């Protein structure tokens, strides 16, 4: 059995428990982060950790089938952090937040994070930039606009 890091980002990381089985282990396993239990009964070979801090070293541990595995990793550094709610977003699930959320995304520099706190945000098309993270806090939901005329048509794409 082996524990591997698939991807480390600024505020999350994805791991795989390589156990010779597809998708699920034979028995659920315990996942710890810096010695504290995160999942008591993880039942997927690939799992994620969230709400991490940028540029921080962590140790993830797995206790599976009598074996203990651990792996130290560092989250990516973050160059900029912006709370998108400071752009005037309304988290009621009905107000169109497309322009305001797009402004937050467009002004975020490379390596930065646009943070969306818990709430329901209605929006149409958003255009992301490379090397920018849109981080949705637990309870944050993006709702797509139901009106197709609010979405651009991109000719030739």
Language-model segments: which ranges?
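Extracellular/periplasmic carbohydrate-active domains that bind, remodel
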Residues: 1-157
């Amino acid at each position: 059995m082996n524990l591997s890091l698939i991807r480390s980002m600024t505020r999350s990381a994805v791991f795989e428990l390589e156990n010779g089985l597809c998708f699920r282990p034979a028995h659920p396993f315990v996942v710890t982060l810096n010695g504290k239990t995160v999942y008591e009964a993880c039942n997927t070979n690939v799992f994620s950790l969230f709400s991490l801090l940028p540029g921080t070293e962590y140790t993830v541990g797995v206790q599976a089938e009598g074996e203990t595995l651990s792996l130290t990793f560092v989250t990516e550094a973050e160059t900029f952090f912006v709370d998108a709610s400071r752009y005037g977003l309304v988290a009621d699930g009905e107000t169109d937040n497309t322009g305001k959320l797009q402004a937050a995304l467009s002004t975020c520099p490379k390596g930065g994070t646009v943070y969306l706190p818990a709430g329901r945000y209605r929006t149409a098309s958003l255009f992301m930039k490379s090397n920018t993270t849109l981080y949705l806090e637990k309870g944050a939901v993006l709702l797509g606009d139901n009106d197709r005329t609010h979405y651009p048509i991109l000719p030739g794409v």
